[in-house]
């Protein structure tokens, strides 16, 4: 284990929208260090969203999608006297954002559209409209926390 907590490294805002969340999203989307490919996919998805419905901005849809997918509660396993309990805990803001990004990318990759740009654009649109697999994942996480509310007193 490390002696000290690692300092949080600051991410630079992306060059087009000046948004740090987009930079984090691109970094999570990246495979094998190919950031230019991930950047093309991300900006392509935002353009595709704007093309589908001209009256909304792609960046607003992206922000709505992130907000709708952020989990408030999650369950953590806690072992007490030989039994393992699923204890509901609140999610820290940084983890909320990280989970939202991870779920959006994971479920976008699992979609059946042809290109990753289309997959990501449609997943972001669904999430912004409170639909889609990533939103369902958030709902399932919340239901698990609600179901195990009785074990909330085992918090750390």
Swiss-Prot record:
It comes from the Bacteria. The keyword Ribosomal protein applies. The keyword Ribosomal protein applies. GO terms for cellular component: small ribosomal subunit. GO terms for molecular function: rRNA binding; structural constituent of ribosome; tRNA binding. Part of the 30S ribosomal subunit. Contacts proteins S9 and S11. One of the primary rRNA binding proteins, it binds directly to 16S rRNA where it nucleates assembly of the head domain of the 30S subunit. Is located at the subunit interface close to the decoding center, probably blocks exit of the E-site tRNA. Belongs to the universal ribosomal protein uS7 family. Keywords: Ribonucleoprotein, Ribosomal protein, RNA-binding, rRNA-binding, tRNA-binding. GO terms for biological process: translation. This is Small ribosomal subunit protein uS7. The gene is rpsG.
């Amino acid at each position: 284990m490390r002696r000290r907590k690692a300092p949080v490294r600051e991410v630079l805002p992306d060059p087009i929208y000046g948004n740090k969340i987009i930079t984090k999203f691109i970094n999570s989307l990246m495979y094998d260090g190919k950031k230019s490919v991930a950047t093309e996919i991300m900006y392509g998805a935002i353009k595709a969203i704007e093309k589908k419905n001209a009256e909304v901005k792609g960046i607003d849809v992206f922000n709505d999608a992130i907000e709708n997918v952020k989990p408030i509660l999650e369950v953590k396993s806690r072992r007490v006297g030989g039994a393992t309990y699923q204890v509901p805990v609140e999610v820290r803001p940084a983890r909320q954002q990280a989970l939202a990004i991870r779920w959006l990318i994971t479920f976008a990759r699992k979609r059946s559209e042809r290109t990753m740009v289309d997959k990501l654009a449609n997943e972001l649109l669904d999430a912004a409209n409170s639909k889609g697999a990533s939103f369902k994942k958030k709902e399932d996480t919340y239901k698990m926390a609600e179901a195990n509310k009785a074990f909330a007193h085992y918090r750390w």
